[in-house]
């Protein structure tokens, strides 16, 4: 099989073996990283071993990052331990980013610990990519992420909270409710958002408390109001109504509360009438 490779604006057809030779023997870093890129796109598992060799031994960071990307595309778990090593030890930030992304594709319980460790990487892009990789892996990462909610570093707690909301495992709800008390506002913002995504009614009282707390950050309170709208629990109706009625002017918080109030009313109107537990008529608002 031959594949077309762009070389100095010329299209050159190269076979699989020619690409392997370029990868392993060319003195040009550009030729080597182009070979790695194309080998990943070709999807031939015979390229895995040469790409692992390059990932471990090539002195050029661009070549190593394309090797990491290619190994993720090929999806062979033989590359997992080598990608973990690159994630932990490679000095090149872009290589660590690509290794994290590749590990997210490969998945499996073995990659969870190194990815969670990378939430504490000195480079923010590595942290973000590791978080996205853990989200891609899904539920198998939940327990390790829950433990990370107690990490001393605020960015780790933020990333773990975000990831747990995206993964959607309700076993994280109790711990994220505790994160509503975190000293850092960014963690609390992620916590209210994630509780909305997790969609567990047990979070309703805690979210109401946050929304009603006038000493809390406005973004956190608005996030709590938005989450209540997602949960659509009738218990939030009166607190939302009181917040709006007591406001001197309608800002972002009150606007969000109003939207959530309407969502909950719409979702529960028939049940409320059947139970005859409310005297609120179905109006435009009140």
Question: Positions of the model-derived regions?
Answer:
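N-terminal alpha-helical scaffold/docking segments in eukaryotic complex subunits
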Residues: 1-41, 46, 285
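Amphipathic alpha-helical scaffolding segments comprising HEAT/armadillo-like alpha-solenoid repeats
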Residues: 9-23, 44-56, 76-88, 108-120, ...
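Eukaryotic tandem repeat interaction scaffolds
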Residues: 129-135, 140-227
């Amino acid at each position: 099989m031959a594949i077309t490779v762009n070389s100095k604006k010329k299209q050159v057809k190269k076979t699989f073996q020619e690409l392997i030779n370029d990868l392993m023997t060319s003195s040009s870093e550009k030729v080597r990283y182009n070979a790695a890129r194309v080998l990943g796109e070709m999807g031939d598992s015979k390229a895995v071993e040469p790409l692992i060799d390059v990932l471990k031994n090539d002195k050029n960071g661009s070549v190593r990052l394309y090797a990491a990307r290619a190994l993720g595309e090929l999806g062979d778990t033989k590359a997992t331990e080598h990608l973990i090593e690159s994630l932990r030890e490679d000095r090149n930030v872009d290589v660590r980013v690509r290794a994290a992304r590749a590990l997210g594709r490969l998945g499996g319980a073995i990659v969870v610990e190194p990815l969670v460790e990378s939430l504490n990487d000195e480079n923010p892009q590595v942290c973000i990519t590791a978080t996205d990789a853990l989200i891609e892996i899904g539920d198998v990462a939940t327990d390790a992420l829950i433990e990370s909610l107690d990490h001393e570093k605020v960015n780790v707690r933020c990333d773990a909270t975000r990831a747990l909301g995206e993964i959607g495992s309700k076993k994280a709800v109790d711990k994220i409710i505790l994160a509503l008390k975190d000293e850092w506002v960014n963690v609390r913002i992620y916590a209210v958002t994630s509780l909305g995504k997790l969609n567990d009614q047990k979070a309703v009282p805690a979210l109401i408390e946050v929304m009603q707390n006038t000493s809390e950050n406005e973004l956190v309170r608005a996030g709590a109001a938005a989450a209540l709208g997602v949960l659509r629990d009738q218990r939030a109706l009166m607190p939302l109504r009181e917040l709006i009625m007591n406001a001197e002017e309608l800002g972002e918080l009150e606007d969000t509360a109003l939207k959530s109030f309407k969502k909950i009313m719409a979702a529960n109107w028939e049940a409320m009438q059947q139970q005859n537990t409310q005297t609120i008529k179905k109006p435009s608002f009140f």
